[in-house]
Amino acid sequence: MEKVVIVDAIRTPMGRSKGGAFRNVRAEDLSAHLMRSLLARNPALDPAALDDIYWGCLHQTLEQGFNLARNASLLAEIPHSVPAVTVNRLCGSSMQALHDAARMIMTGDAQACLVGGVEHMGHVPMSHGVHFHPGMSRNVAKAAGMMGLTAEMLSRLHGISREMQDAFAARSHARAWAATQSGAFKNEIIPTGGHDADGVLKQFSYDEVIRPETTVEALSTLRPAFDPVTGTVTAGTSSALSDGAAAMLVMSESRARELGLTPRARVRSMAVVGCDPSIMGYGPVPASKLALKKAGLTASDIDLFEMNEAFAAQILPCIKDLGLMGQIDEKINLNGGAIALGHPLGCSGARISTTLINLMEGKDAQFGLATMCIGLGQGIATVFERV
């Protein structure tokens, strides 16, 4: 079986969805920009030699519809002979895109693929066109379709206080801002054209979603966003709405070596698991455990974790049940997470994997695990190993 390696991993800056940097930039353009950039950074690979393009996107309608992956590849002027498909596993879409490409390579059906994902939450709102089947209420709680309420339920089940949530959210912004100031994101962010507050076209090379002024004291004044009476989850402890894309060049190890390309990481194992939709945010726990089992590892073997911060109330129970509460500052989301950077739904799986690989290189780590929850009760995880 072929070994799967990540040759390169990049992303756009994360733009605010409400009047942000990419308010006049389409999702296909963000995607095409990264496709072109990956190929430009790796000229040893002939674009015509790509076997497929797997691109995650959740809301596949409006500008994100009609197979966005193919539209973006055509905009990027990738040869017409290279196919492309848009993948949807809700929040896990771009990590699923990685898994799909990895399996193709493992079985010998492909040697080189572009993978990634995008979500323009400013142009295609999260609730656009959503209409759940009424019959689902027979076996799934209505609140299962309301992500904030699932986070509330999870926090109550696991004893996660408002104070714990506020502290974690403040940490996310502080870590992300420190990473920005130190240049830690420089190797993963590709400068991307957008418009500033005055409408002037400029190149953005930083995440505009981060709020460096965030404090626990300020967060403590916010009202609950989803359960106004007894709730603890606020807008400040939820992932920010943002627009962005992320991409990876994935190859068989043999093809990468043949082309003289240096692999940055190897895909050690992959897993997807279902869980109760009412506590959908718990999905990373069983998914991570299964991925670790497949890799022949335990949580203690993992040097660094990237866990998508859908909500502080969601990620803290996962950290707790993976036995990592005492290692947050040493191992988990060292450059902040989605609370600070935002969670462009179809982009986030590739984004956290990209950030993880860069962190692994910076910290000289051997093993890393990226994982995320998925709406309606799923979790997805990938174990990476430095080559």
Swiss-Prot record:
A biological-process GO annotation: fatty acid beta-oxidation
Pathway listed: Lipid metabolism; fatty acid beta-oxidation
Transmembrane segments: none
Source taxon at top rank: Bacteria
GO cellular component: cytoplasm
Catalyzed chemical reaction(s): an acyl-CoA + acetyl-CoA = a 3-oxoacyl-CoA + CoA
Alphabetic keyword roster: Acyltransferase, Cytoplasm, Fatty acid metabolism, Lipid degradation, Lipid metabolism, Transferase
Subcellular locations according to the entry: Cytoplasm
Pfam family, one: Thiolase_C
InterPro entries linked: FadA (IPR012805), Thiolase (IPR002155), Thiolase-like (IPR016039), Thiolase-like_sf_Thiolase (IPR050215), Thiolase_acyl_enz_int_AS (IPR020615), Thiolase_AS (IPR020610), Thiolase_C (IPR020617), Thiolase_CS (IPR020613)
EC class name: transferase
Protein name, as recorded: 3-ketoacyl-CoA thiolase
Assembly information from the UniProt record: Heterotetramer of two alpha chains (FadB) and two beta chains (FadA).
Functional description taken from the UniProt entry: Catalyzes the final step of fatty acid oxidation in which acetyl-CoA is released and the CoA ester of a fatty acid two carbons shorter is formed.
A GO term for molecular function: acetyl-CoA C-acyltransferase activity
